[in-house]
Amino acid sequence: MKNLFGVLAFASIIFACSGYAQQDKPRKFEVTKTDMEWRKQLTPEQYTVARQKGTERAFTGEYADNHEKGKYQCIGCKLDLFSSETKFESGTGWPSFYAPLVDKNVLVATDNTHGMSRDEVMCSRCGSHLGHVFDDGPKPTGKRFCMNSVSLSFVKAK
C-alpha cells in the first residue's frame, strides 16, 4: 500500500509538471519589438491579451456581435487573419470563425496553462496571442477559432 501511495504521488507530480516540459521552443517572428514598444503601441488591455496571453471577458469584446462584411487583422502587425465570410455565432461571447483567411497567417501551438491542454492561436508574423481553436465548430472545417476582440482590428469591406 505504501508503494502504491508513493507511485501515485510521483505520478501526480510528473503530471502537474508536464505542462512545463511540453512548452514549445521560443519562436522568432518577422515583426519583433521590445516590450516598451509593444506597450507604447497597444492599449493596456490589448497588451495584456496579445502579448501576455490574457483573455478578455466573454460578451465584452467589440467584435463578438459584429455582422459587417470585412476582414479582421492582427492588432500588432495588421496581418490579415480572418474574414467575415467564415465568422459564425458560437454563443461563447467571443468572435468565432471556422477558418482563417489564409492558413499560414495563423500559428497554432499547444497551451498547457490552467491545468488543461488547448490549442493556442497566434499571429504568424508578430506572435500576438489571438485566442484558441477548438474542434466543435461548424462545417466545413469543424473548427472554432475563438478569438479575443482586443487582439483584432476590423477593416470594413468597400
Predicted regions and their residues:
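Short N-terminal segments immediately surrounding and downstream of signal-peptide cleavage
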Residues: 23-39
